[in-house]
A protein has these predicted regions:
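Acidic, low-complexity, intrinsically disordered interaction modules
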Residues: 39-94
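Amphipathic alpha-helices that form helix-helix packing interfaces
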Residues: 17-20, 24-27, 31-34, 67-70, ...
């Protein structure tokens, strides 16, 4: 990945870094705990009923705890540290890298 020279090193304050790590830790450990609660068999196999309960619990956790909002806030704190100078492709470094991402899309057969 080729970055604008200004973006080769970004700086966060200690408070910002702790806030970001706290958000990530809350989400990551909570999701792990939900999975461990429902997936108790070492093989990872569960009944459809348990899988449905796991999916419902995960969705409720995401919704009730504003996970998308929390992640958006983290993204904003990190993104604001970057220079948004446009490169030759008329995109900044973040846009150029995010363009490579493959995002979830609605399945074609629905």
């Amino acid at each position: 990945m080729k970055l604008n020279k200004e973006n080769e090193r970004i700086v966060l304050s200690g408070h910002e870094a702790i806030d970001i790590l706290s958000e990530i830790e809350f989400i990551l450990i909570s999701l792990r705990n939900i999975a461990r609660h429902y997936y108790t068999d070492a093989s990872g196999e569960v009944s459809q009923k348990v899988r449905s309960a796991y999916c419902e619990e995960t969705t409720q956790f995401i919704d009730k705890n504003n996970v998308t909002g929390r992640l958006s806030k983290v993204r904003g704190v990190i993104s604001e540290r970057f220079s948004h100078e446009l490169g030759m492709e008329n995109m900044d470094d973040i846009e150029r890298e995010m363009e490579k991402m493959i995002y979830w899309e609605k399945p074609v057969d629905e």
